[in-house]
A protein has these predicted regions:
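Conserved N-terminal catalytic core of the sugar/cofactor nucleotidyltransferase
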Residues: 35-98, 182-183
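Conserved alpha/beta core of the MobA/IspD/sugar-nucleotide pyrophosphorylase nucleotidyltransferase superfamily
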Residues: 3, 159-261
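Short, high-confidence coil segments that cap the C-terminus of an alpha-helix
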Residues: 47, 72, 99, 126-129, ...
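Short beta-strand segments
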Residues: 8-12, 53, 104-105, 132-135, ...
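Hydrophobic packing residues within well-ordered alpha-helices of enzyme cores
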Residues: 18, 42, 62-66, 120, ...
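N-terminal glycine-rich phosphate-binding loop and ensuing alpha1 helix
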Residues: 2-59
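Conserved beta-loop-beta/alpha segment of the NTase-like Rossmann-fold superfamily
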Residues: 76-77, 83-145, 162, 167, ...
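Short beta-strand-to-turn element immediately C-terminal to the catalytic PLP-Schiff-base lysine
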Residues: 29, 141-144, 205, 214-215
Length: 262
C-alpha cells in the first residue's frame, strides 16, 4: 500500500513587519501572490494532499482567487489559522484525516520547488523527523537582556533552520497535542515541538540559501529577483533540451542516410 504524504502551507500571518497593510502572503511577486509559489511546488510534486491555513476572513478569497484560479487541485481544505504559528500548525494537523507523513511549510517562502519537496519526502521516510536548513555563514552571539554578548557558539555547530519541516504524521500530531495540553507556546518551529514532546532526534539537511522567508519590503525585492532568475534559467534549460533533441534528430537522420548509401 502506498504511503500518503500531506502538506500544510501556513498563510495566516499578518505581516506586521511588512508595513503595507496587506497580509504578506498576498503581496505580488511577478504578478502572482506570494503563497502561490509554495502551493505550485506542492502541486507539481508527489504530495497527495495540501491543507492551506489562512486567516478566517480570507478563506473565501483564497479559494476563489488562488486555489480555484490557479487550479491547485491538491488543496483539499482551507482552514482558519490560530493566534500564533504553532496554533495554525495544530489546526492544520487537525484537518488531516489520514496521512503517513506531513510536510509543514511557511507560505512566505516562495523559493521552494518540487525538487526540494521530493528531497523532503526522501529524508522524512528515512529519518522520521527532518528539517530543511543551511549551515550558518555568520558568527552568532548569545546576548543578555541589555544586548551584551555572553557567549559565542562554535559556528560549525549552527544551522539556519528553514521549511519544509517534515515528520511522521502521528509523531508530530501527538507532539503538538501534548504541547497544547501543557499550554506551552515557547516553540518557534515544529522541530522544537518534536524535540521536546516526541523524544525523536531531528535530522537537518541542506536546502538552499535562497530559501528565504519574506518578512520585509527588502525581502520582497530579493524574492522578486530570484523568481525572475529562476524563470530565466528554466527557459534556458528548456532551450537546451530542445537543442539536444534537434541534434539527436539530425544525427539520427545522417546515420540513416549513410546506412542507405551503403
Amino acid at each position: 500500500m502506498e504511503e500518503k504524504i500531506a502538506a500544510i502551507v501556513l498563510a495566516a500571518g499578518e505581516g506586521k513587519r511588512m508595513g503595507s497593510g496587506i497580509p504578506k502572503q498576498y503581496m505580488l511577486i511577478k504578478s502572482r501572490p506570494l503563497v502561490y509559489y509554495a502551493l505550485k511546488a506542492f502541486e507539481e510534486s508527489t504530495v497527495d494532499e495540501v491543507i492551506l491555513v489562512t486567516g478566517e476572513d480570507e478563506i473565501d478569497y483564497c479559494k476563489e482567487y488562488i486555489v480555484d484560479r490557479y487550479h491547485f487541485n491538491k488543496v483539499t481544505k482551507i482552514v482558519p489559522g490560530g493566534w500564533e504559528r504553532y496554533a495554525s500548525v495544530y489546526f492544520g494537523l487537525e484537518a488531516i484525516e489520514d496521512a503517513d507523513y506531513v510536510l509543514i511549510h511557511d507560505g512566505a517562502r516562495p523559493m521552494i520547488n518540487a525538487e526540494l519537496v521530493q528531497k523532503c519526502i526522501y529524508y522524512v521516510k528515512k529519518y522520521r523527523a527532518c528539517v530543511v536548513g543551511m549551515p550558518s555563514k555568520d558568527t552568532i552571539k548569545v546576548v543578555d537582556e541589555e544586548n551584551y554578548a555572553v557567549r559565542t557558539p562554535e559556528r560549525k555547530t549552527l544551522w539556519q533552520v528553514q521549511t519544509p519541516q517534515c515528520f511522521e504524521f502521528e509523531l508530530v500530531k501527538k507532539s503538538y497535542e501534548k504541547m497544547m495540553e501543557n499550554d506551552d507556546g515557547k516553540a518557534t518551529d515544529d522541530a522544537m515541538v518534536v524535540e521536546t514532546y516526541g523524544n525523536v532526534p531531528v535530522k537537518l539537511f541542506e536546502g538552499g540559501y535562497d530559501n528565504i522567508k519574506v518578512t520585509t519590503p527588502e525581502d520582497v525585492r530579493l524574492a522578486t529577483n530570484r523568481v525572475r532568475v529562476r524563470k530565466i534559467f528554466h527557459k534556458l534549460h528548456i532551450l537546451h533540451d530542445k537543442l539536444i533533441y534537434m541534434q539527436m534528430k539530425a544525427y539520427k537522420k545522417r546515420f540513416k542516410e549513410k546506412k542507405q548509401k551503403k
